[in-house]
Amino acid sequence: VIASLDHSGGQGTSAYHQQPLWAPSRVPEVNSREVPKWMEQADVDEVIEGFVNAARIAISSGCDGAEINAGQHSLVRQFLSGLTNHRDDAWGQDKTLFARTIIEKVREAIGDAVIGLRLSCDELAPWAGITPDMAVELAPQLAACGLDYLVVVRGSIFSVEKTRPDFHEPEGFNTDITQRVQEVLNIPVFLQGSIVQPHMAMSAVEQGVCAGVEMTRAQIADPDLVNKMLADDVAKIRPCIRCNQTCQVRDARNPIVTCVVEPTSGHESTDPNWYTQVASKKVAVVGAGPAGLEAAYTAARRGHLVEVYEQRNAAGGVAAFAGPGGTFVHWLYEQCVALGVRFHFGVSVDETTNLGADVVLQCTGSRPGVP
């Protein structure tokens, strides 16, 4: 278990804490339009000590190590970048000094525990920001300070939409830069970049692109993803469709992180086990859209005999045609078939008045919602 250590610096808003944002230079936050405070030496020292103390707390709490964030939303990246670091003192003349100092002092504080770095290797702002070529030179300098691994990410204050893109962006967009960084380092490098399909993750590792792959959203959609991969049961992995509807976590209100395709995710401590085996009943489900398929899947897993009635000639409802939704409903349909669920297509609602079932679930009539 690795604790993530972060300070967002000049990115964000003072609306909640009512204190000025801190940053290397007074570069406006393009989203909140706030101008941050230029960090004085005492401020710099305080933040460095904060990272050190946080690392100590993480280790004393049982974590195996700490990961320092120099990614898209981080103060550490802001010191590394010419976009946001315009200082003429030591912290600006050597833009790596802040990051190197934090890594070295954290290493002194936690000894042999694991230390990782999350590094933005492309700020997508070539006029002044960190570019892939710069990152290839930068990574070895930072690794030499005592890193055990490095995670390649991308983005900056000027490219927030690229931080955690949805399905409009191709999967594995950081593959090329990750491989370049891996080639110049002798520590493990991890690939991050909207990879949600197991075969893509395995391919990246097998081809030597990286030592491992981050699959955060994929594991929100299916918390058992790793276990299913180890058991060679990939077909049963509930697919993440990268819709970004309920899994976004950068929210000061601290909402529950859950998932559109797996609504029980995030509610494990309060919801019952929906798949507990019970006395078998005959269950009829009217409608084979996402709701009907999920109801049929859940009922079948609980041991019921399930039959689904759908007016159209295929399952999935409107979701089958909406963006990446077809991927999910196709998976759900295949899982239902594998569980023995019987489907009856071309059956109108009027024809489902006498089904002879113990339980009838009406799952028709979807309504449009605001994303």
Could you describe each region identified by the protein language model?
Residues 1-286, 290, 294-301, 367-371:
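Flavin-dependent oxidoreductase catalytic cores
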Residues 285-339:
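Beta1-alpha1 glycine-rich phosphate/pyrophosphate-binding loop at the start
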Residues 189, 306, 343-345:
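Generic structural signal for residues in well-ordered beta-strands
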Residues 202-213, 220, 314, 320, ...:
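C-terminal structured "cap/appendage" subdomains that terminate the fold
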Residues 209, 309-310, 358:
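Exposed boundary/loop context
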Residues 261-264, 334, 343:
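A broadly tuned "polar low-complexity/structure-edge" signature
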Residues 243-251, 339-371:
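FAD-binding core/adjacent interface of flavoenzyme oxidoreductases
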